[in-house]
């Protein structure tokens, strides 16, 4: 997995999903299939991307009791995916069960720390601590549970890199300041400079597909 850009395919409409996929190059990027596409278009959304040669990040953010997550991962691991997500806050046992379920594959498990849509006021209300404190607690839990990496905002990359050997996936990548639902963001260059292994970029790329001949521009 040498490609560091992951383009988010967050489309529930088959025509729009295909349109985005057709304009991307599997030699330049991976693709993320999340709950929007997977829940509406099913496993075929993953299989179609795989047939076009893409490495796939399945981002379903599984979060349930340990046995349920283990069975869910077992049911998904036969898909042609490279990485998948669970919620780190599901606890050590849940994380360990997810790793055990893919032990005979090359799939990597990433734990979501704190959603990039959450501001400090949100994390204070939900977790009774600042976003960085919540992420640090999840880094420690991820390390203890032997998962492969974490999903964090680019603003917390230094916390991960200075306190663990975990791989990092960073959503919240913006080319400029936008009035949208992301709270903790950075530009691609800032995220790379801070050590991100994989950058998830959705709307900044997919919105260009309707105004530019090619997103590679």
Language-model segments: which ranges?
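Hydrophobic faces of well-ordered beta-strands that scaffold small-molecule active sites
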Residues: 5-8, 31-33, 56-60, 84-86, ...
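Alpha/beta enzyme core
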Residues: 20, 26, 78, 127-149, ...
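Active-site-adjacent loop and "lid" segments of alpha/beta metabolic enzymes
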Residues: 111-135, 159-194, 198
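Active-site beta-loop-alpha junctions enriched in small/polar residues
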Residues: 8-12, 34-38, 63-65, 89, ...
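Glycine-rich phosphate-binding active-site loops on the catalytic face of alpha/beta enzymes
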Residues: 86-90, 194-209
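Active-site-adjacent beta->alpha loops and helix N-cap segments on the catalytic face
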Residues: 37-49, 65-71, 88-103, 154-166, ...
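Conserved anion-binding
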Residues: 68-72, 81-145
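Conserved small/polar residues in nucleotide/adenosyl-binding loops
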Residues: 210-217
